[in-house]
Design a protein with these regions (language model features):
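Glycine- and hydrophobic-rich flexible loops that cap the catalytic core of alpha/beta enzyme folds
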Residues: 1-212
């Protein structure tokens, strides 16, 4: 079911803008005393659980827990990949280690493109492996998405007047890059039923039966 990663900067920026607008709107409601649970729902992801032990051995990391699970993504891989790249950007810029994520029980999921050997390694090190993207079209688009996220959040180059800072000014929020990073971190880490000043991002998850 998989195809290569093909999101352009336009699609990446649209997702970032939607998330920040939602977080800003929710924050302003919170400071007005409106505290009902809210969450931003991404378009559905359709998946099938992988139960073949031999396939799992090839997919899961060697240090994976015994009860670790893996899923074949039927629909939604572009969104999941972009969210993964965004999260990798955030933890890199905020100097958050893998050990800290495990301690906080918010360890990032892993992605492997069956059509691209080495995709999981490339994604795990994205931002530090630009030389590898020139010979692989999927890696090129992934690297471009990472670069777009960086420019948009920092509001530089083509996003100087139409990046995250301009949205924050519109909603009377801090335009410091560190504060914008924290908004996205809070948004992605928040759970649906727990209070958060910026709300929560959730994914509708549809599971297909093995025989479908």
């Amino acid at each position: 079911y998989q195809r290569g990663y093909r999101w352009t900067s336009i699609q990446v920026v649209q997702l970032l803008s939607d998330l920040l607008c939602y977080a800003s709107s929710t924050f302003n409601k919170r400071i007005q005393g409106i505290k009902e649970g809210e969450y931003y729902c991404l378009q559905p992801v359709v998946a099938r659980k992988i139960t073949d032990k031999e396939v799992l051995k090839k997919i899961l990391p060697k240090d994976a827990k015994k009860d670790a699970e893996a899923w074949e993504i039927i629909d939604g891989q572009q969104r999941l990949t972009t969210l993964y790249i965004l999260y990798k950007y955030l933890i890199t810029k905020c100097n958050i280690s893998a050990e800290s994520l495990k301690e906080d029980e918010i360890e990032l999921y892993h992605l492997t493109y069956a059509t691209r050997k080495g995709s999981s390694v490339f994604l795990a090190n994205i931002g530090n492996n630009d030389d590898e993207c020139n010979d692989n079209i999927d890696f090129f688009h992934m690297s471009q998405a990472y670069e777009t996220i960086d420019k948009w959040i920092r509001s530089i180059d083509e996003y100087e007047l139409a990046g995250a800072k301009s949205l924050c000014q519109r909603y009377n929020l801090s335009t410091k890059v560190s504060d914008i990073l924290n908004i996205f971190r809070s948004l992605l880490n928040a759970e649906k039923d727990k209070y958060s000043m910026y709300g929560s991002v959730q994914v509708l998850w549809y599971e297909l039966a093995d025989d479908k």
